Swiss-Prot record:
Keyword tRNA-binding: no
InterPro entries linked: NDK-like_dom (IPR034907), NDK-like_dom_sf (IPR036850), Nucleoside_diP_kinase (IPR001564), Nucleoside_diP_kinase_AS (IPR023005)
Function as written in the Swiss-Prot or TrEMBL entry: Major role in the synthesis of nucleoside triphosphates other than ATP. Possesses nucleoside-diphosphate kinase, serine/threonine-specific protein kinase, geranyl and farnesyl pyrophosphate kinase, histidine protein kinase and 3'-5' exonuclease activities. Involved in cell proliferation, differentiation and development, signal transduction, G protein-coupled receptor endocytosis, and gene expression. Required for neural development including neural patterning and cell fate determination.
Record text on subunit structure and interactions: Homohexamer.
Active site: H118 (pros-phosphohistidine intermediate)
Alphabetical GO biological process terms: cell differentiation; CTP biosynthetic process; endocytosis; GTP biosynthetic process; nervous system development; UTP biosynthetic process
Annotated family: Belongs to the NDK family.
Name this protein carries in UniProt: Nucleoside diphosphate kinase A 1
Enzyme class per UniProt: transferase
Main location: cytoplasm
Record's comment on post-translational modification: The N-terminus is blocked.
Keyword S-adenosyl-L-methionine: no
Amino acid sequence: MANSERTFIAIKPDGVQRGLIGEIIKRFEQKGFRLVAMKFMRASEDLLKEHYIDLKDRPFFAGLVKYMHSGPVVAMVWEGLNVVKTGRVMLGETNPADSKPGTIRGDFCIQVGRNIIHGSDSVESAEKEIALWFHPEELVNYKSCAQNWIYE
């Protein structure tokens, strides 16, 4: 598929605890994106500090790392045409109060500190985040039989 890209999506501890893993995966699959990697894990503080390094000078940084380390997360890599941009639209705004109904955050979240999901904000960020969370051999390349029904 031409112009295919990959994005990093992580279901945060609140999304895991609330039993939303299946619903989130379902939405990405139903859209037509292809899951190429997934881990259910408790992220180390070092991994989280590196992941959120751009926010290290913000007053909420320590609390964010502590919260993300408080329970398991589901780290995923999704692939498809415009998956970074479309994935961000599917997630909704960072602040759930600004998210439209029909988005993941608009349907399932109330407060910004418990917004259940992370998604890469650019192709460059996605590449960096995927390399941080996954080894190359953990990314599975395959052709989905549905691909011909999703793309021209």
